[in-house]
From Swiss-Prot:
One of its GO terms (biological process) is proteolysis involved in protein catabolic process. GO terms for molecular function: ATP binding; ATP hydrolysis activity; ATP-dependent protein folding chaperone; protein dimerization activity; unfolded protein binding; zinc ion binding. CDD domains: RecA-like_ClpX. It comes from the Bacteria. Residues 1-54 form the ClpX-type ZB domain. This is ATP-dependent Clp protease ATP-binding subunit ClpX. It comes from Desulfatibacillum aliphaticivorans. SMART domains: AAA, ClpB_D2-small, zf-C4_ClpX. The keyword Lipid metabolism does not apply. Component of the ClpX-ClpP complex. Forms a hexameric ring that, in the presence of ATP, binds to fourteen ClpP subunits assembled into a disk-like structure with a central cavity, resembling the structure of eukaryotic proteasomes. ATP-dependent specificity component of the Clp protease. It directs the protease to specific substrates. Can perform chaperone functions in the absence of ClpP. InterPro entries: AAA+_ATPase, ATP-dep_Clp_protease_ClpX, ATPase_AAA_core, Clp_ATPase_C, Clp_protease_ATP-bd_su_ClpX, ClpX_bact, P-loop_NTPase, Znf_CppX_C4. One of its GO terms (cellular component) is HslUV protease complex. The lineage of its organism: Bacteria, Pseudomonadati, Thermodesulfobacteriota, Desulfobacteria, Desulfobacterales. Belongs to the ClpX chaperone family.
Amino acid sequence: MSKKGDSSDHLRCSFCGKNQDEVKKLIAGPAVYICDECIELCNEIIAEETEKGAVDSEFQDIPSPKEIKAMLDEYVIEQDHAKKVLSVAVYNHYKRLDTAFDSKDVDIQKSNVLLIGPTGSGKTLLAQTLARFLDVPFTIADATALTEAGYVGEDVENIILSLLQNADYDVERAKRGIVYIDEIDKIARKSDNPSITRDVSGEGVQQALLKIVEGTTASVPPKGGRKHPQQDFVKVDTSNILFICGGAFNGLAELIQRRQGEKVMGFGAKVQTKTDMKIGDLLVQTRPEDLLKFGLIPEFVGRLPVIATLGELGEESLVRILTEPKNALVKQFQKLFEMEGVKLRFTDSALSAIAKGALDRKSGARGLRAIVEKAMLDIQYEIPSMENVKECVIGEEVVMHGEDPILLFEPSKKKA
């Protein structure tokens, strides 16, 4: 009950001692009183403790590197080295955030990651799977769409805006999110000599990205954007955001081979040609100096201390990708057909044909879905209207030449 109107002089807040005339409200309890100011202070203390407890709980639940890799194994085939490197880097990153809350005596640097590998080798999938497993906000940006501020194109701050949107405008969650920047190799400068002219989509973009990658306070439009120009911009500290950059880096293997060739010159030196070594074996030996020669600026290379390389995927690997992961294409289509009461089966030769098609397109795992969708289009159109179909068998001819699949009907209802 409120005692604001009570004229008794002895009514005071039991916590701060102020009398009823010095506060807005005085709430009475059994032999005690509390004022509105003390209530507000108590609410602030409780909110701070609750937030700190939630953060502490979040960091105590960080999975170990082995647990992270085991989860990645469920969705990404092969690439064990990259998965191990990424697992350790992500674990250390979130432990670093934990340390930031508990200790101020050691400054642990952020472990941003550079993923190097051919198109369709699993770079984007690794980043997506990590973010989903860790339950943190995640966004993907295309480096080729970015330009320096003042030029037509996407500003680098838009990356943080996208992350904030995916965090439902929860700034604290966004500050612990993961950003994946794809096609990072496409913003390399044209030579390893500093440019004296404007490079709107190359060196200039690297300089712009450098600020948010190393840690800055980015100003992004509020919810509603330009519809509410009177609103203040939202400030997001990027110091604790994990940045994962990925690219195919075509031509990097040749730079590495050239560097190695210079060091093995002389009598009796064993020289390995490009045919002797796979591109993946060369990329594993990537050094910062190779990235500098490729066209990344020194400051940007320095902000990506962890390098993980992914190898090329062969036919056998692509077949495994079609069938083994939790989100495997074959499993997805089998589930869709199961909903129609039909068992779907792909022959081994059909799976090999799909894998070979992706290899011919030089698109890696990324090209698998387009090939499968094309092969399955007609039968997906027909099956819902057909009766008594028990099983559908997809053979090599369906994939290669668009022939009809084999349909097996219920024996008792099979028509002559």
